[in-house]
Design a protein with these regions (language model features):
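Sequence context surrounding c-type heme c attachment/ligation sites in exported
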Residues: 38-134, 180-251
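N-terminal export/targeting leaders of redox proteins
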Residues: 1-52, 109-184, 196, 247-251
Length: 251
């Protein structure tokens, strides 16, 4: 019988680690049904005031507008509950009221139940109809739509401003981000894909230091909703789709 020396034991452990799926090292959070992914329940004050919470379907809005319209021009914070939305503000043209004024979209007066449904799956039927009409490219996870590819192909052309035209910055630099674990190939970050939807200040400097390698982040933190996880856990494609960021990863 061959003796197991310390060197052989270490070698065996390395081989076993390389043979195991990299994502097996992380506990991925459970995902909602495809038709509910990206539907955010907003309940900062609604329940306290005896109203059903608002359900915000990102898919419905991102088909028409880029992220920067709400999370820039209209001052919606990325953090849930951090924006002091009120009925009074909406009726005076702030926040949701910037569009829901009876001209761009239905007005809030007399249409309370359209937003205050309290049911994250209320728009499931409309979502399926939308997919059939648009024929958007599909994705393996999230709500099943590759939104960025849909924009690249011109299938959808979301508007990037309401009144304040954004100053687009031509920056298409692609970053190669080395992973902390040797068995995981580098992540590829395409700026151009993100700037099609966002402004630079949506990420810099609050989420990421603008200096290269100035932000030290790990997958464990991303899975807690920090850094990339601010979007890629709730609205943008989730962490389950490993190869979207780590293209060198194998099954």
């Amino acid at each position: 019988m061959m003796a197991v020396t310390p060197v052989r034991l270490v070698t065996l452990l390395i081989v076993l680690q390389l043979a195991s799926p990299a994502w097996g090292h992380f506990t991925l959070p459970p995902l909602p049904p495809r038709e509910e992914y990206g539907n955010i329940i907003m309940d900062r004050v609604s329940s306290r005031e005896g109203q059903k919470p608002v359900v915000f379907p990102h898919w419905l809005h991102r088909a028409r507008y880029t992220c920067r319209v709400c999370h820039g021009e209209l001052d919606f914070q990325m953090k849930r509950g951090a924006t002091e939305i009120s009925e009074r503000g909406n009726r005076t043209g702030k926040f949701c009221g910037a569009c829901h004024n009876g001209k761009i979209a239905f007005r809030s007066n007399g249409n309370c139940d359209k937003c205050h449904s309290g049911d994250s799956g209320y728009s499931a039927g409309r979502f399926d109809e939308f997919l059939m009409k648009t024929s958007l490219p599909m994705a393996a996870s999230g709500n099943g739509v590759d939104w960025s590819e849909g924009v690249r192909r011109g299938i959808i052309k979301p508007q990037s401003f309401l009144k304040k035209k954004s100053q687009d910055m031509a920056f298409d630099r692609q970053l190669l981000l080395e992973a902390e674990m040797a068995i995981i190939p580098p992540a590829v970050f395409p700026h151009k894909t993100h700037t099609a939807w966002l402004d630079c200040d949506n990420c810099h400097p609050d989420l990421f230091n603008i200096k290269r390698k100035g932000t030290h982040f790990a997958m464990e933190e991303i899975l807690k909703g920090r850094y990339c996880g601010v979007c890629h856990m709730t609205v943008a494609f989730p962490m389950d789709d490993c190869r979207r960021c780590h293209p060198g990863m194998h099954e």
